[in-house]
């Protein structure tokens, strides 16, 4: 009988997993693991795995390091981390980047947001390229009626003008120089190449002629709008291509007699591709994608089971979670290792919590990760001097049994996993904790606490995948895999109220098994900017036909028969004026994308935009080739009735007994079973432990385990939702609640971003969501905009005091007035009370978002020249936007549109429709927060929830007191002093006096200048925000940011100074300018770092509505340079301190607004020199294509960002208007820091933002 060998291999960082199936005269199926790196025995782990399988198949020993005969092998499928590791370790090819002139630093600036709000060093991934060439070319968008010569139509149907043809000669010389310097890899991304790829294709021809071997064009890889992620994708592909190709070529050399399509690799999108077509950009998530395919194909109870499943893959350093509901969920833009890329990939959420995650006692709270012990030294029990980890906690609690692990630990890799060292280290930690909390905790209680915190941490991304989309978690199965997942499965399911857990027999190698079940795929994509309606449908269908033929032809050329190939059609749709796209699959029997899109949008966001056109952004074809000898799924039951009709075996004899610790019942002597010894249809009642050669399954009390042929099914035996009324208030409980409160805030933010319409909220992320105590004190917030986080507390407290005793369930409040805790008028705050049994307010949920326009004297409501608050738009102290459950749209319209227009020279909101939609989005976010709080109260009881809330605030208070006491000692108990001056000369003065015994501190702003006849007056809430931000940044630890941070602080602000202005004062600049200057002064007083750019560089442009049409407004805050510190250089081109909003992608700007972005790059040498230099500012240069109002609101234009400790000052910013009313003699006008101009068509504005100050004297 002819033999057929199929092999699937997942090469991970530590272990390589192998699944194989041998058919024919020697039938065999099996799995094994081997070390990914073991140079003493083999050069390449996958090749070694294949050699071992061939030994099994032939019954003969095959020597190592000789080519292997693959005659009997029909399939080798691999997932690999080669590209991932090269990216993480920065071991790719020397690469150059070609981009349109004026944008050389675009990728470095990115979206200008910093990864960690409170990291003053602003650590960002460094660029992957070594050189940049600016191609002399420019293509700009036009409308079809433009009379300008040279109009062409792009692939999307958009009209463009080739303003400047590519200078081929100059480019040739630049590329030739690169080639002579040893470059062989280039990436290319030119403006609007997603629709006009011709210039990129010319670059490719020139580069090939010179001899470059790796050329990645953004227009070919991901022809989608947004140049930044498209460019990053091209750069990654170019950077990794050579490394990946070297590995693939080396791998192929290990074999001979290889049939076509034998060796295939997993792509990030969950499809397989032949080794010769495997690309770097598709390889980044190869391993995790294989795991998702594995659980998707093995998590059905029976063939007709439609229950969606959550995949839970717990590894050593992190945990991956994903969802499958009968179809794979893809995303097309993602943040990978801090890099935003465009590439189809499975939607996999990762959290830095795994078996190797380290355990910490910090600020009287338990903390798990994100630091990891890694493969070496690994957990303490590995006997290589490692720290305590989640694995060690499981060992201590009896959930991992060392006797069932091989003796591969210790310096000589010949010892057993060691529990004694774990007991010793936990005992040391116990002594520290018990002293701090003044209670007696056992090492088991402490270890269990860390496990509970780890479990709660791992639940957060699962809730994000489901509850934030409005999906019911309890309606899912949990599919658990990965080496560490089995020890946490029951606890995770209980936390999520999931009743069934599915664990495949190959769960510890499910990524490898998933490869065996995957299909070969090929995708084709085409940009297609069309309105989705009956008139355009024939054109859209014809484009689909072109892609369909192309995709099918590709697979046929690979050797697949037409009968093996099927196709799936997708349209990437969005509402007009909205950048949120949804990839919608074509219905089987119709072309009704519209209905599916509207239903999907409403299901996910809670509403639809009835009056908006639906736009087709791009179309995509996914062609799937199914192998004839491959099974589709691997279900738990052979039939739908197997579980109900089966008599299960209950009297199984355990292998041994072992003590296991559980939170509910303490230590229990548990049965231990070996999975291989359990007959099919065995029933194991928890608590128990089931061990296998590659995994350990913990069956907790109230769970049972049913053994099937290829699965273990864990089932909850009683309701998961139990009111935990007897929970003690201890650090474990508080840490768990800190995670739950944070999760609520995060989900509120996700709902707000998804349901909002405006660019400000949805794209720039200019919003914040938070949870507040019954009296309005901050409890928890997601990491949104710092200027909002501390100030929202003031707003919620004002509303609480104003409405005390007068609110009823269903009431929701709206406010933006500075006197009521607002900061500036475009920031609307929605406050939702949460009631206990419709009686008492037990929490508040609040959301704040920056509206595009709320009226006033200029479009965008950010006037540079306002002198009174009414000029800045609608001012609302309090308003019941929802009264007893009824949304008052008429009242809201009156406040936003009618009232502001009553004042001289003022308009009502120019974007009323978007504003109302965004308010509804904030209502949706608060509704989500309220429902989650109510659920939490039902689960635990109100008493423990609120006591935990206050306990977490107390922990934050202690952390701040400890830091302040340390500063007092460091400064010899002297007051900390600083003074700085606004650009108009107004002083901003601070003295901080700290009590060295208690940590109490007075922040006294006596000496600060009076209210100004301008708009940079700062409502008092802004100072509170700045103080809380600085304290959290100085602490530099992951503590909860809440009201407790301000408990030790007394803030004294003189009456009538510009930090405490009158009710009618103009304040629009206080939030966006003065907040940054307050922050600089505080950090200066504490001698933390040099000044950052001290500004948000607020640029607004737009025009009023005419003839019944809405007006237009666009608002940006622009990055600058960060200040240097005692151990770090300042980062260039980044938002600092009190803001972290994103900047709109250049291509999106030019699509949406009648402007051309001429330059967006770093302002070289604008950072202050020093031992550590300040970061550079940026240059952002617009040309206006019609007359528009333009306002610039900025600081640091007359006073430079200071250096510290001998470091030099950063450069001041400059705002320049180029008046081109006479094109032959343009007029260059310095606008100063704050000004408003009516720009004519063809005029320009150039914003040069400040650099950061340097730190330390320059070495000579």
UniProtKB/Swiss-Prot annotation:
Q: Which GO terms describe its molecular function?
A: 5-oxoprolinase (ATP-hydrolyzing) activity
What InterPro entries does the annotation carry?
Answer: Hydant_A_N (IPR008040), Hydantoinase_A (IPR002821), Hydantoinase_B (IPR003692), Oxoprolinase-like (IPR045079)
Q: Which one Pfam family would you cite for this protein?
A: Hydantoinase_B
Q: Name one GO cellular component term.
A: cytosol
The alphabetized list of GO BP terms reads: cellular detoxification; glutathione metabolic process
Q: Which PANTHER family match?
A: 5-OXOPROLINASE, 5-OXOPROLINASE RELATED
Q: Which family does it belong to?
A: Belongs to the oxoprolinase family.
The entry's protein name is: Uncharacterized protein C11D3.14c
According to its UniProt entry, this protein's organism is: Schizosaccharomyces pombe (strain 972 / ATCC 24843) (Fission yeast)
């Amino acid at each position: 009988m002819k033999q057929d060998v199929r092999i699937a291999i997942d090469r991970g960082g530590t272990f390589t997993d192998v699944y194989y199936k041998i058919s024919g005269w020697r039938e065999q199926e099996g799995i094994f693991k081997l070390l990914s790196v073991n140079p003493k025995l083999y050069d390449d782990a996958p090749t070694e795995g294949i050699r071992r399988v061939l030994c099994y198949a032939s019954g003969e020993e095959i020597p190592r390091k000789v080519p292997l005969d693959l005659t009997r092998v029909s399939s080798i499928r691999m997932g690999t981390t080669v590209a991932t590791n090269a990216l993480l370790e920065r071991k790719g090819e020397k690469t150059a980047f070609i981009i349109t002139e004026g944008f050389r630093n675009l990728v470095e600036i990115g979206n200008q947001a910093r990864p960690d709000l409170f990291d003053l060093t602003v650590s960002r991934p460094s660029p992957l390229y070594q050189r940049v060439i600016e191609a002399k070319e420019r293509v700009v968008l036009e409308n079809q009626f433009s009379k300008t010569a040279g109009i062409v139509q792009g692939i999307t149907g958009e009209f463009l003008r080739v303003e400047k043809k590519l200078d081929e000669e100059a480019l040739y010389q630049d590329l030739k120089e690169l080639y002579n310097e040893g470059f062989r890899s280039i990436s290319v991304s030119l403006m609007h190449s997603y629709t006009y790829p011709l210039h990129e294709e010319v670059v490719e021809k020139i580069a090939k002629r010179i001899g470059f071997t790796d050329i990645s064009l953004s227009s070919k890889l991901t022809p989608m709008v947004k140049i930044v992620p498209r460019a990053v994708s091209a750069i990654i592909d170019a950077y990794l291509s050579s490394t990946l190709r070297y590995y693939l070529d080396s791998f192929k050399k290990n074999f001979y007699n290889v049939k076509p399509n034998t060796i295939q690799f997993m792509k990030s999108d969950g499809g397989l591709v032949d080794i010769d077509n495997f690309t770097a950009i598709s390889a980044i998530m190869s391993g995790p994608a294989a795991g998702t395919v594995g659980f998707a194909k093995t998590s059905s109870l029976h063939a007709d089971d439609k229950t969606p499943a959550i995949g839970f893959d717990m590894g050593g350093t992190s945990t991956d979670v994903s969802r499958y509901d009968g179809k794979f969920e893809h995303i097309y833009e993602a943040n990978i290792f801090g890099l935003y890329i465009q590439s189809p990939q499975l939607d996999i959420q990762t959290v830095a919590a795994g078996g190797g995650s380290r355990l910490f006692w910090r600020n009287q709270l338990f903390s798990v990760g994100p630091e990891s012990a890694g493969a070496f030294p690994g957990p303490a029990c590995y006997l290589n001097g490692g720290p305590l980890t989640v694995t060690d906690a499981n060992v201590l609690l009896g959930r991992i049994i060392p006797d069932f692990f091989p003796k591969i630990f210790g310096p000589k890799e010949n010892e057993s996993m060691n529990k004694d060292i774990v007991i010793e280290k936990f005992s040391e930690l116990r002594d520290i904790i018990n002293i701090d909390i003044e209670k007696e905790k056992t090492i088991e209680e402490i270890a269990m606490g860390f496990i509970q915190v780890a479990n709660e941490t791992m639940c957060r991304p699962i809730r994000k995948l489901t509850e934030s989309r409005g999906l019911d978690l309890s309606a899912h199965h949990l599919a658990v895999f990965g080496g560490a997942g089995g020890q946490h499965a029951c606890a995770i399911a209980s936390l999520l109220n999931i009743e069934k857990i599915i664990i495949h027999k190959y769960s510890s190698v499910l990524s490898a098994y998933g490869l065996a079940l995957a299909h070969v795929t090929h995708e084709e994509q085409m940009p297609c900017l069309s309105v989705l309606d009956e008139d355009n449908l024939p054109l859209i269908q014809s484009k689909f036909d072109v892609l369909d033929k192309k995709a099918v032809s590709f697979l046929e050329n690979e050797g697949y028969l037409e009968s093996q190939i099927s196709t799936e059609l997708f349209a990437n749709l969005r509402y007009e004026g909205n950048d949120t796209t949804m990839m919608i699959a074509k219905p089987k029997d119709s072309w009704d994308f519209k209905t599916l899109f509207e239903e999907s949008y409403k299901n996910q966001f809670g509403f639809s935009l009835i009056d908006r056109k639906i736009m087709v952004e791009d179309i995509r074809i996914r062609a799937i080739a199914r192998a004839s000898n491959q099974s589709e799924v691997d279900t738990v039951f052979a039939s739908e009735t197997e579980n109900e009709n089966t008599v299960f075996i209950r009297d199984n004899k355990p292998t041994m007994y072992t003590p296991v610790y559980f939170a509910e019942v303490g230590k229990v002597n548990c049965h231990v079973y070996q999975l291989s010894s359990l007959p099919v249809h065995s029933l194991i009642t928890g608590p128990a432990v089931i061990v296998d050669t590659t995994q350990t399954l913990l069956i907790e009390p109230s769970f049972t385990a049913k053994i099937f042929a290829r699965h273990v099914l864990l089932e909850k035996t009683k309701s998961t939702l139990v009111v935990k009324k007897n929970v003690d208030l201890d650090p474990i409980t508080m840490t768990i609640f800190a995670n739950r409160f944070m999760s609520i805030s995060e989900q509120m933010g996700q709902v707000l971003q998804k349901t909002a319409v405006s660019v400000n909220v949805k794209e720039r992320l200019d919003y914040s969501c938070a949870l507040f105590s019954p009296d309005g004190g901050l409890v928890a917030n997601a990491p949104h905009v710092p200027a909002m986080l501390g100030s929202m507390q003031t707003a919620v407290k004002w509303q609480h005091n104003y409405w005390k005793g007068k609110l009823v369930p269903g009431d929701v409040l709206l406010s933006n007035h500075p006197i009521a805790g607002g900061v500036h008028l475009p920031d609307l705050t929605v406050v939702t009370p949460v009631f206990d049994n419709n009686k008492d307010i037990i929490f508040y949920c609040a959301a704040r978002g920056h509206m595009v326009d709320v009226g006033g004297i200029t479009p965008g409501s950010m006037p540079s020249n306002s002198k009174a608050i009414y000029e800045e738009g609608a001012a609302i102290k309090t308003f019941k936007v929802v009264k007893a459950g009824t949304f008052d749209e008429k009242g809201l319209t009156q406040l936003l549109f009618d009232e502001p227009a009553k004042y001289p020279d003022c308009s009502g909101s120019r974007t009323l429709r978007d504003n109302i939609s965004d308010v509804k989005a904030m209502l949706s976010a608060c509704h989500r927060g309220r429902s989650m709080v109510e659920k939490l109260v039902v689960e635990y009881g109100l008493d423990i929830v609120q006591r935990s809330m206050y306990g977490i605030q107390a922990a934050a208070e202690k952390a701040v007191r400890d830091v302040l006491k340390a500063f007092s000692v460091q400064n010899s108990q002297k007051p900390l002093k600083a003074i700085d001056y606004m650009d108009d000369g107004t002083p901003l003065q601070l003295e901080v006096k700290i009590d060295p015994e208690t940590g109490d501190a007075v922040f006294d702003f006596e000496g600060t200048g009076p209210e100004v006849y301008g708009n940079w007056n700062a409502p008092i809430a802004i100072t509170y925000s700045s103080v809380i931000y600085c304290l959290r940044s100085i602490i530099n630890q992951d503590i909860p940011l809440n009201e407790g941070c301000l408990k030790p602080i007394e803030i004294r602000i003189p009456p009538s100074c510009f930090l405490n202005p009158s009710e009618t004062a103009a304040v629009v600049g206080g939030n966006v300018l003065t907040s940054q200057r307050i922050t600089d002064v505080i950090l200066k007083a504490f001698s933390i770092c040099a000044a950052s750019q001290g500004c948000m560089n607020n640029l607004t442009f737009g025009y009023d509505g005419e003839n019944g049409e809405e007006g237009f407004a666009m608002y940006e805050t622009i990055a600058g340079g960060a200040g240097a510190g005692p151990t770090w250089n300042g980062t260039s081109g980044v938002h600092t301190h009190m803001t972290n909003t994103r900047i709109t992608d250049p291509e999106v700007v030019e699509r949406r607004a009648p402007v051309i972005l001429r330059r967006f790059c770093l302002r070289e040498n604008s950072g202050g020199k020093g031992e550590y230099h300040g970061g550079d500012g940026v240059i952002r240069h617009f040309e206006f294509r019609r007359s528009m109002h333009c306002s610039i609101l900025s600081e640091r234009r007359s006073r430079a960002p200071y250096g510290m400790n001998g470091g030099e000052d950063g450069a001041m910013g400059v705002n320049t208007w180029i008046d081109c009313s006479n094109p032959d003699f343009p007029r260059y006008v310095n606008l100063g820091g704050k000004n408003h101009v009516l720009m004519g068509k063809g005029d320009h504005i150039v914003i040069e933002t400040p650099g950061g100050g340097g730190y330390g004297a320059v070495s000579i």
